[in-house]
């Protein structure tokens, strides 16, 4: 099935930060969007959204019936928001249900939210790094091959779900695009970035990475439109770091024993987006540097 047949798209997790952005991006690009979330009705942030609990397979089937593709963003979005068991069980159940329902209904494409945490975050966890320890940073820039290295039940739920996506894509022949999304920021969040600069250790946990919510939405749309087969997973991050110092210098200060595998630009992200660029055509459009006054980050 070609991408030209994708007209009606279900966005799950539509009331969340990424979901709201994806709904807006897709509607602005001419897609007919069915928005759904278990939290519909809480604040009315997405009009016309349908309430559905995707831990129930029957509800997953019902919300996907009649759409051409799904952008699946509904999950417990971070570690520590629920118990480890609930985080793992609910996320894996939601992901399996949506993936299997999409395959059973013959959808053309599944784009879904994996996570940067599959790569080993939080980096530098604990007083000392040693091979195999949680948070071991093996090289930089980190790419998709710095995997799987889950250190929380949340990260483990995403690793398990990437395996589920690969298995279902194989027998269904439906392309799956997993987005290993970095720490999502809205424009209002950028005002706190200067507070990170005095202590680079404060953001070492994800190598000073972030991504604008509007670029996450872009990646969701590109995932629908890219010419791909099988199951692919790509890092989605901003083109730069949260820091006002060169990336090489910050890395050398905090992780002096970690090797750079290639030259990096002055403020270039240390979460490599090269694969997202080559596979999806992803080029981030937004940076905190466009929002924070120049004198604040000189």
Regions found by a protein language model. Name each.
Residues 97-151:
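Conserved Rossmann-fold NAD(P)-dependent oxidoreductase catalytic core, especially the SDR/UDP-sugar
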Residues 214-298:
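C-terminal substrate-binding subdomain of Rossmann-fold SDR/epimerase-dehydratase oxidoreductases
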Residues 184-201, 206-232:
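Alpha-helical substrate-binding/gating segment
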Residues 9-29:
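N-terminal Rossmann NAD(P)H-binding glycine-rich loop of SDR-like oxidoreductase domains
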Residues 162-187:
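Conserved beta-loop-beta element that borders a ligand/cofactor-binding pocket
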Residues 31-42:
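Conserved glycine-rich Rossmann-like NAD(P)H-binding loop of the short-chain dehydrogenase/reductase
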Residues 42, 52-93, 101:
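NAD(P)H-binding glycine-rich loop region in Rossmannoid oxidoreductase-like domains
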Residues 153, 157-160:
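Active-site helix of classical SDR
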């Amino acid at each position: 099935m070609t991408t030209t047949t994708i007209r009606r798209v279900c966005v799950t997790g539509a009331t969340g930060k990424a979901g709201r952005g994806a709904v807006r991006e897709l509607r602005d690009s001419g897609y007919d969007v069915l928005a759904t979330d278990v939290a519909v009705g809480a604040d009315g942030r997405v009009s016309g959204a349908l309430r559905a609990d995707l831990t129930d397979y029957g509800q997953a089937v019902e919300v996907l019936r009649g759409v051409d593709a799904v952008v699946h963003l509904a999950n417990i979005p971070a570690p520590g928001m629920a118990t480890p068991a609930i985080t793992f069980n609910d996320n894996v159940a939601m992901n399996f249900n949506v993936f299997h329902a999409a395959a059973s209904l013959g959808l053309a494409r599944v784009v879904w939210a994996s996570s940067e945490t599959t790569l080993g975050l939080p980096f530098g966890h604990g007083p000392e790094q040693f091979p195999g320890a949680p948070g071991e940073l093996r090289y930089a820039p980190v790419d998709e091959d710095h995997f799987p290295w889950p250190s929380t039940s949340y990260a483990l739920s995403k690793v398990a779900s990437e395996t589920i996506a690969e298995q279902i894509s194989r027998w269904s022949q439906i392309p799956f695009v997993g987005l290993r999304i970095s720490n999502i920021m809205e424009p209002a969040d950028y005002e706190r970035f200067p507070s990170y600069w005095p202590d680079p250790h404060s953001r070492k946990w994800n190598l000073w990475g972030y991504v604008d919510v509007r670029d996450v939405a872009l990646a969701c749309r590109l995932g629908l439109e890219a010419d791909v087969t099988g199951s692919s997973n790509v890092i989605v991050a901003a083109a730069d770091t949260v820091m006002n110092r060169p990336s090489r210098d910050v890395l050398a200060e905090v992780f002096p024993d970690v090797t750079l595998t290639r030259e990096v630009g002055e403020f270039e992200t240390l979460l490599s987006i090269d694969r997202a660029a080559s596979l999806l055509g992803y080029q981030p459009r937004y940076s905190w540097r466009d929002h924070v006054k120049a004198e604040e980050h000189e």
